[in-house]
Amino acid sequence: MKKILSTLTLTTALVSANVIADIRIGLDSAPYPPFSETNASGELVGWEVEIGAALCEAMGETCEVVPVAWDGIIPALLAKKIDAIVGSMSITEERMKTIAFSDKYYNTPAALVAAKSADIDGSPDSVKGKIIGVQVSTTHQNYAQAYFESMADSIKTYQNFDEHNQDLASGRIDAVVGDSLAFEGFLTSDAGKDFEIKASLNDEAIFGPGVGAGIRKEDTELLARFNAAIAQIRADGTYQKISDKYFDFDIYGD
């Protein structure tokens, strides 16, 4: 595995693969800014990378970040290839049948994005005959299937967030469903300048109460330590200090 140090300030908690780590943290191998991405120097950077490092430091553990394809990340956890998922995974009842979750560490709404000129408002009728893009194995896919599938031409799945944004920009699909915050990079780019958020999408039964760390059900001690670490970095200001570098609002949510 290639070296994936985040930044020099994080090396006390995140290590490269040639060092034996106490905890292996899995996240999506595809870029997902501002949460995680690889910079020009080959370093893994982003808000969630820094939060993961802070949690490891709070637990007094050395952690290795292991990039995993999103649709294989829960199987990797169950197969003990990783020990925890700190990768923007929503806490849902369906996933909790298979794995356990820590307390939430952030919560942002989902959104429907389409061309500024498109007459789409987030209602099922407004996507009639449209092709909707979603990342596979996500709550966004579940929402699109529940609310839009009966009216849309089709729901097209993609392996990662960037792929459906590229197809949207090229006109191969009409709209995409994803995390509202993750769309910011696309919407402020040249490729995304003609697109906008058409609607915020809410359904707690689908999206859950927020994002938590995914843990194997039997690892109850590790789960308790993650919960304690989340509470600690929230209380001591570390969480806010990291968040202020990326956001001008409270990402923790309600």
Model-found features: residue ranges?
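Short helices/loops that flank or line small-molecule/ion binding pockets
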Residues: 57-58, 66-67, 71-83, 98-100, ...
